[in-house]
């Protein structure tokens, strides 16, 4: 019953058309299987005709011609049958897979957020089902199932013919089926287990490579290249060992197929007894022997394909389970109350809540909160106090464990979920955008909005100006997850998306956190206006977003401890007051440096002219540097001619295995024609009249067949193991060298779209795998095939050159037929992969942004996108289905026609006295088997083409010269640096936007041992200063000096050992907290006490020790298991452990709440003592105590001095204007 349920899961997506296609396909597959046994029957009669020839027989050609004509009739029938098989299965496979992907993704988007927290550990889980699972089932339906049916019917048909012709021999041969099945089943089981382990081993190595490449700035800054490559190499060693085991298993399995020769030997011996004792003809005996071995082999292939049944069952059940799952909070459920009018009054009554993924942690304990309609309520509190949980519960991402949440006195549990969410607009702290245009992203908020409404929403969110500056305006593509936009730009698009919805309830979770102060002021005014008449819930660190709130609620340990207006709470002098005083203390003495316009009067022009974030420029301009530099680096522009000779040179350390492998392949290749030649001789023996001669010759050939079986076993093991050894170690060497080389490239190379982390990791995985296949499998097959062809042609030309020439002339037809059939299947697979790749991208994006999709109820919009991306591949697949049917039919019919020609022409030569029957028997089998071997090798042309591209890709990477050499042998290696930094007349523009100059004749002196703050508006070049100091980029003109020496003259990795960087967005690696802190030192020998001290100094020790595993807590992919503030503190601890001479802080405390920021800032100021420090920050707390503050504007330093001296300049000073503007934004 369970098996039937599993089978139903495979076919559950079939409709009436699909069942009709599968019915016709069944007829075709079964018919295809019976074609070969029918041809065997005709061949038996032909061989008997040839064996009974006498020179006086004038009627010899009549039965030959008659049977050859019968073969042509079979050829015509086979075209129709094989067309049905090829077309119907291919078509229904694509149709069912497309419906499966659509239904699965729809079911995924239907699930509640709690499901993703509990059951989806990573996006790849969903991608696997959308891509791999659907592809497994499509491949099963299109290829594996018809193959199973065809082979099963071929087995039945062969034994039917065997019993019809010679039942005694068939019965004797029947038990040998078991011996024919064992090798395939044995290898199949071993291969599945080893292949799974190899994937798991390489996934670990691939994860290390992906981390290194996606976080390349962090890897470079902490000089962790060697550490990453060593980890990568260690991880690869496991897959190498498994690959050798796989090669050995393959050699044993293929060698065990030599049992066919032994079975043939026994059956020919028994068949000789049938000839002598019962008078059976030689053609009948030899054909029945072929039927027995062919039938057993066909059954083995059918059974070996049954593992695909199992894989398809598992994939189908996994998909079916998701499709049938009804979530607890079902957005598709249209039942539920819809309020005719909604005021927006929100009430939390005695709410207790635990997250499904953390049931041991109580977030709310008896929470009571009332939010009047049309009022703005701000939620404040420490990290983990439950602020964001309020919003999640209100949107019904989760349901509380106890208590009720009401809107207008109606429980939200009784409301229709989709309608409920449609009444809310949400802007999150980390905006989620989709890989489509800006306009389409804004329309996610309201699908039927007009373009004018889109523009108005963009204007209201202060996004219209920067959108208009793009060449394509609102049609500008934002890239995957908005990668082409800066943080502030993404946030403003997200705000526009929320405003266009005109929601009754507005939810703002750090909605302005990514904006500079000028943009924040304008956007905050827009949000304030949008809040009028709406119930608004605000979560924010900055006071500017909560001071004007009607009600401020202070959360602590899951309860509201204070509530009231700002003034009322200040009078209470409680927890809120302490938070305000803490922030005021810092705001009164310092100024924001990255976000503010220079003067209030100059703000508008700055906003219009400088509306790009430096990180946006860093991303978008760097690729132009590659373009410009490529003019002077020919190898980057000109594709290499693939050098297979050079590839072989990389395999030189394995030369002994190469020699052994080639010798074994040559000997193995000779086996097939020798076996066919011997079989032909044995057939001619059957037609001898002298029984003693039959016995004597049979004994010789039987011993020869047994010898070939043993010989094949040992040469196959030697061949497969040797070439696997070559392939595995070459693959490991290529991957190591590629990653090592990639981690020397300048940063702007990684900013190229084609050099994304995903693309590079794909190159590491796929290109190296193709090269391994090229060396480990294809070269082995090529050497073996060359040996086969040479031996076959030599034997043929010696025995009967006329017949041999004709046989050779038709071989290309057979080869082309096999080749087209194999290549066509590969092309079909490629089309399927294209469809699933597009679906996978969409699924990955949808799962990554599931909260956004859930918030805006955008499931149908995503499904329309899926329909759009699958439309092209679906049309192409329909065309390919016709081609598959036509070519499969043509292949089978042409092969049958060539057999008819060979029999007819051989008979003609015998009738004319130009060849004897014995020669025909010897040569016919040789070229029949050789043609198939050549065809198998012929399919390598696509593999060779693919291999050529991969070899080209590999050497393009290995031969590329980086423009910023990290291991320059002539570079100055320093033991210690003082830290004096000088920028002298520096010109700089990011490569992707060479016309937008960041620095123009820029000069600044950063004194050793002193702290220097860099402030100024967006795009003034603050972060670029750090990029140039770290030498992520080089200036176009001018010099950057450290300790009086041009930075380009230093040994770069040696220089970076003395610098440390803490970025705005902390990068952690998938490892433990301890391992991430240890990245601060190149050495792996670090005392535990040093790690703990670094954690304490960074204010991280307390939260780390509160975790169940302490410093051994796993951080997750990119630190996903930790909050932003926790990640930042670990990053700071990593920097503290490095103890650098130059400290670079780019928004180092931006992710921390006020209390944590104060402690960490004290720690940083302690660490900064005696070090050259360059500080960039939005918050004033990080620059108020700096020795020097430099104000940048339009790529130049317009003011510098201490905080006090710059304020003393009064209203005419740029810095004074920044301070004034900030105070206005903070306190208005």
Curated annotation (Swiss-Prot):
SUPFAM superfamilies: ABC transporter transmembrane region, P-loop containing nucleoside triphosphate hydrolases
PROSITE patterns assigned to the protein according to its UniProt record, in alphabetical order: ABC_TM1F, ABC_TRANSPORTER_1, ABC_TRANSPORTER_2
Stretches assigned to coiled coil: none
Entry binding sites for ATP 2: 1016-1023
Pfam family, one: ABC_membrane
Domain ABC transporter span(s) in chain numbering: 346-582, 981-1219
Residues holding ATP 1: 381-388
Keyword ATP-binding: yes
Location in the cell: Membrane
Molecular-function GO terms, alphabetical: ABC-type transporter activity; ATP binding; ATP hydrolysis activity
Keywords for this protein: ATP-binding, Glycoprotein, Membrane, Nucleotide-binding, Repeat, Transmembrane, Transmembrane helix, Transport
Cellular component annotations (GO), alphabetically ordered: membrane
The family this protein is said to belong to: Belongs to the ABC transporter superfamily. ABCB family. Multidrug resistance exporter (TC 3.A.1.201) subfamily.
Protein name: ABC transporter B family member 16
Organism: Arabidopsis thaliana (Mouse-ear cress)
Gene for this chain: ABCB16
